[in-house]
A protein has these predicted regions:
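Cation-handling catalytic/transport regions enriched in His/Asp/Glu
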Residues: 1-173
Length: 173
């Protein structure tokens, strides 16, 4: 049996995010950059990120709300749609924005949030849902991203991403 608590020092949130974002660059040729302050947030712990093509063209954004707040947030982890990719009547494009919400232990002092391997898997899983939403190229709201995905396929991107937690190059990052 694996002791999840013993693994926490190996998975500080900043390094896990760096590994996840690096994986997304390798797999999808996108860059994920912090954009804190570019979008309003509902809590000081919430971060905002931009997703860009390798040429720098913005294609999406997402909020990351990583830490537990039992008084104001339900348990578990989830991804949801904030804005879907769509085209306005004037021809301009609304870029997709996702929410990624987790309930990890907050940082303590100078020590970052330390994740169990199960929490790492959960983050990758939920980010897979987010990628399906953010990387869509369909501009029709009823067919873009996570909209109207058949139930037998809804977990495919999330489980695909989750499996990368066992990839040695991903773990080394």
């Amino acid at each position: 049996d694996l002791d999840q608590e013993a693994l926490r020092p190996w998975f500080p949130l900043p390094q896990v995010l760096q590994g996840l974002f690096s994986l997304c660059t390798r797999l999808f040729d996108v860059e994920i950059v912090a954009a804190d302050g570019e979008a309003p947030t509902w809590n000081d712990d919430v971060r905002f990120f931009r997703v860009k093509r390798s040429d720098g063209t913005p294609i999406a954004g997402f909020y990351l709300d990583p830490f537990s707040r039992p008084a104001s947030k339900r348990g578990g982890a989830w991804m949801d749609e904030c804005l879907g990719l769509s085209k306005k009547p004037d021809g301009s494009v609304v870029l997709p924005v996702a929410y990624l919400v987790c309930n990890q232990t907050p940082p303590v002092g100078d020590t970052p949030s330390l994740m169990s391997f199960e929490e790492v898997e959960t983050l990758f899983h939920e980010f897979g849902h987010g990628l399906q939403h953010m990387l869509t190229t369909v501009e029709e709201p009823e067919a873009a991203g996570i909209s109207n995905v058949e139930w037998d396929a809804v977990e495919l991107p999330s489980q695909f991403m989750e499996n990368w937690c066992y990839d040695e190059p991903t773990l080394r990052r």
